[in-house]
Each structure stands twice: as C-alpha cells, then as structure tokens.
Amino acid sequence: MSKFSPPINRNMVELDRSFFYKEVPLLAAYFPNPKFLGQFVKSCQNDILYVQTVKHIISMDDSKAILLRDDVKSISDLNPETQLKINEFGIILKPYTLKLDYSFWKSEEILKSILPENLIDDVPSGFSQAGHLAHINLRDEYKPFGKLIGQVILDKNPSVLTVVDKVNTIANKFRTFPLELLAGEPNYIVEQSESGCKFKFDFSKVYWNSRLSTEHERIIGKFNPGDVVGDVFGGVGPFAIPASKKNVIVLANDLNPESYKYLQENIKINKVEPFIKPFNLDGREFIRKAPELLLQWHNSQNGIIEKIIIKKVSIDDNKTKKIFERKPIIETTKIPKFYHHFVMNLPDSALTFLDEFIGLYGSNPQLKTDPEFKLPIIHVHCFEKFENNENPTPEELHNRVYEKICKLIQFPLNKKKVEFHEVRMVSPTKPMFCVSFELPEEVAFKQTK
C-alpha cells in the first residue's frame, strides 16, 4: 500500500471525516538560497516528490524547500547527480511531515477504504448530474452502503447538493422511478443547461437523462429552419426547445402531466413560444391527430409564424461614419401543412407505436400535390437486448430491428435507406439504437377504416 493511500476502516457505518488524517514523514531539500531552485528541479526530476495535488515546492524557515521522493531516508538514497547538486548549492536535508486529511483523497479512494473488500473492485463513484442533483444507480450489493456512498459523492463534488438512487429499476408509464435520498438536500427541482437552452423540472416526477445530450444535439442537427417536427415523447423539451430556437416548428407531446407542465414552463423560460406547441396526449393519440393539430396551428396563424427580433439598422448611409439603432423587425416563417420529422424517444416501447403512422395522411390525399410536400423522416429510439451467451454482430442487430419495423408498418423498407445509429450501450447486452427512415408514401397515404 502506498504511503499516500487513505487509512482503512471497513466497519464504518457513518462517515467519519476525522478518521482520514494521516502524517507522511518525508525529507525536504532546504535552500538557504532559493535562486538555485529552478536548476535543481530541472536537473533532479527523478528525486523530487510528484504526487497529484501535493505541491513539491514548499515554504520552510523563511526560504523554500523541495519535497523529495517518499522512499528517501538519507542523502545516500538520492541519485549521484542530485547528491552533487546538494553539495554545490549548499542544500540542507531536513525532515518534513506532510499532513493529509479527508480533502486530499478522491471519492473513489475514500470509498475503497471503507467499503467491504469484496466490493472495492467496482466502486460506484460515478454518477449522472442534472443541475445540483447527482443520480447514481447502485447495484443491489451496494445499496446497504448507499448513505456512505452518497455522502462521499456529495463532499467531493462542490456543484452537487443532492444525491439520489433509484429504489428499483421498474419504471412507471411515465418513465420515472421512486428515488431514495442518499445525501444532501431533499430538493428535486433542478435547473439544467443543455444545447444552449435552460431547463427546469422536478427530477423525481419527469424523465431526464443527461447522458443523452449528445444524441439530442445529433437529432436536432438534422432539422432545418422552417421544418415541422412532431416530438411524440417529448418530455420537458430536450429535443423540442433547442430545435425551436433555430426556427424549427415543433409540436411537442408527452403523456406525463408533470412533463407537460415543465415543458410549458421551459418554453417560456427560453422564449420560444412562437415555434412550439405543447400537448399532453397519449403517444398513439398524438400521432393519429398530428396532421389535424398541425392544420389547426396553420389555420390559426394564417400559415405564418411571426417572430419579433431586434436588429441593428443603419439610419444614415450618407455620412462617413454610419449611425445604427436597434429596431424591432418582424421575421416570418411559413407553416407547412405536413411534417418533415417525427422523433420517438421512448426506447422501451417506441417501436410498438409505429403502426399508428399507417394512413397518417390517408384522409388528405391531396396533400402530396403540394409542390413543397415531403414525406416525414421517422427517428425512433429502441433497445435491442440479446442474451449473455449471444455475440451478435451490429449487422445482425440491425436486421432484427429492421424486421420489426417492417412488420409494424406493414411495408418492406429499402434497408439501404434506413439509418442505424448506436446511441450507447446501456449494459453489455442492451444497446440503444436510433433508427431513421423515410415513411413510405404507400404507408403514409394508405386508406384505413
């Protein structure tokens, strides 16, 4: 064990920070004349103490000193060149006691010193963070030590004020889980920044996953200003609000009343009211009604969204030095009567909703006569879990998902035009994909009862 390892107490029930005090005896090279410090450091690197967060140059007796390697007991333990420099510079070796306390060690090091020995190989010191709240997923064997783990995480991360764990892994229909407060304040109202937007929500009542921020931005990057997007399982707006900031027209839906409430609040916080309409419907109902909801919005605005922006405008072009003033300008965006994209970020079950797109425009066949008409791109997130004894290739997993989609929409998609993107590995046997494909005309305009 290193001299710089924390003390060990595997019987600790409540965190005792005072237990983590340690004195490390060292030798210091004291410089009566500190002008030689730089030369010594340059020439004697191998004999200097380099430990993360420990400053090897210290103040001592009205001058400076350099801490030497922790295994140095006398001058004879130093390299010959270092011994020469000590004599040349008139350096004096003096004993020095390095005092370490709880603040010195990282959370993982602290936890490895207090958890049972059979649990130290995979210490749960990592977490996802939303605002001031840290969310950890403790495996069953670590749950008895949850309070200890939570307190250490709280102590070691200044931006964290609340630490929670899932009570179980079974989500309700709103994708939320019962939470246990492990440490800190029982405050679940968080404020989170993502994609240049601000989000406010109750972490205990809505779905939010900070690990998906890259995926949010990837999908948003596919939208163009003036596109219409249907966000079927929109949550508090991680897709919808950043998209609407770039003048994308979004109809955002979520079944959870709490998500709907915070979606409305986040729309106001980010001042994107002109470009987004929130809905609190079941996903199937939202898809069925999507064309009608868009048409209602189109008609209520006479087909135009007006947005007031402030621009610098030149008010005198005749003078050598131009004079500008800030003026409100009305920027207009045409509202199409059709969708360019649908986002379905509900990986547990989104695939099962795809059959609702059959006949999406079946009652409005004249829509395809619009010279600007485009069929929507569906972006559906899904898991494709496999057994521990399997070793499927990415192509095999893609085929499994592809076959499910074709069966659900009752149409053989051209697989070459289907995009598969692996979002992340939730577990070693549970990849999360986003599959993007254009809804075929035969499906979109199919006549249904």
UniProtKB/Swiss-Prot annotation:
SUPFAM superfamilies: S-adenosyl-L-methionine-dependent methyltransferases (SSF53335)
Protein name: tRNA (guanine(37)-N(1))-methyltransferase
Single Gene Ontology MF annotation: tRNA (guanine(37)-N1)-methyltransferase activity
Binding site for S-adenosyl-L-methionine: 216, 254-255, 282-283, 345
Superkingdom of origin organism: Eukaryota
Enzyme class: transferase
Subunit structure: Monomer.
Cellular-component GO terms for this entry: mitochondrial matrix; nucleus
Function: Specifically methylates the N1 position of guanosine-37 in various cytoplasmic and mitochondrial tRNAs. Methylation is not dependent on the nature of the nucleoside 5' of the target nucleoside. This is the first step in the biosynthesis of wybutosine (yW), a modified base adjacent to the anticodon of tRNAs and required for accurate decoding.
Cellular localization per UniProt: Mitochondrion matrix; Nucleus; Cytoplasm
Pfam family for this entry, one: TYW2_N_2
Organism encoding this protein: Candida albicans (strain WO-1)
Keyword terms: Cytoplasm, Methyltransferase, Mitochondrion, Nucleus, S-adenosyl-L-methionine, Transferase, tRNA processing
